[in-house]
Amino acid sequence: MKIDIPCPPAEVAHSRTLPGTFYADPVIFEAEKQAIFMKSWHYACHETALAEKGAFVTLQIFDQRVFVVCDRDGQIRAFFNVCPHRGHHLLEGCGQEKMITCHYHGWSFDLTGRLAAARESGEGKKFVGSGLCLKPVQVGFLAGFVFVNLDTGAAPFSNFTAELAASIANVIPDLSGYKVREGTSYFGGDYECNWKVAIDNYLECYHCETAHKSFCDMMDVKRSTFTLHDNFIYQFVPSGGKETSAAYPINLVEDAVDGHFWLLFPNIVFSIFPGTKNFSVSWVEPVSVEMSIRRFVTLTPDNISKEREAARSKWGLSVLNEEDRQICRSVQNGMSQRGFDMGYYLLDSLNGNLSENTVRQFHRMYMRWMFPDAGVRT
């Protein structure tokens, strides 16, 4: 169901930010669900979770349930997690099954989604379900991760992410050797803010020198740069060249020393953080207009120090992530204050990251999805 909301003023995503109401109005949040999240790509799992035939994972995108499964030929497929007979859900959690069986009336489907058996539908019964299939969901792959899209009319994920995939491969060409290790996947915690507050904050390091002291002691944020694309934003933060900092120790010879960060619209982040070699995906999951959850999954190669990786992860979660959570909580409160209407951008024509060009680009992407007739270009 399409929800019509007024297009914001013309200066939005040019000289002014999105209005505060776009972060605090439940009606706008509901409109975003339909215009953005029911049509965009969502993280499902790493492909190693589906390495065995019949292996499956489930996920929920707002009120829509989905499962992803490896069929008997090794192909990864996704379906809406609902039985077409009477609407009961089919699978829970993750696991491995030879058939997909509904525990309401016992209908079963093979791993390609086709109806295999409807209990008691033999001779003498009127049955019109022959040839029935589960409704498929689009699947895409990037950097070993599996993504799904509820919009059957969406362009293939490979088209949407072609430039992004090339950018990641250019930075980390040996990524295929990285795996999800025990202890490297973790939950980032609740963010008491609208999802866009968290993304806005992530996209600029203009606030880093005042809000992230240990990060700035480790990195040379003044030499940060960015590139803007139609569907993603890339940020590069060079190393400060110190093995010892207020954050955690770095081996300048063996470790990843620079920071690389990619945002895929609307809410998926890929990153390489200084320290033991790593590659992460994280996403800001909208829960309500004023609540989000940030989740992380990290890949690492075989030959890393588990102790040093744990130290890097601990700092990221307990220091950097916590600093951002506090910032975002305060900003969310400001979105409904009478003294705030629309914000301003600090822009840099030289693509320096101590600016908010990246935030403006994100707002332009947002406007293009929410108001396609407004003529906003990215």
Residues of each region from the PLM?
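Short, contiguous pre-domain boundary segments
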Residues: 3-21, 178-180
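Non-catalytic accessory segments flanking enzyme active sites
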Residues: 18, 22-61
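Generic structural signal for secondary-structure transition and capping sites
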Residues: 37-41, 88, 207
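Short Pro/Gly-enriched beta-strand edge/turn motifs at strand-loop
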Residues: 39-51, 118-123, 263-268
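Short clusters of hydrophobic/aromatic residues that line enzyme substrate/ligand-binding pockets
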Residues: 44, 90, 115, 215, ...
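Rieske [2Fe-2S] iron-sulfur-binding domain
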Residues: 49-152, 156-167
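C-terminal catalytic domain of Rieske-type non-heme iron oxygenases
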Residues: 69-70, 75, 81, 145-378
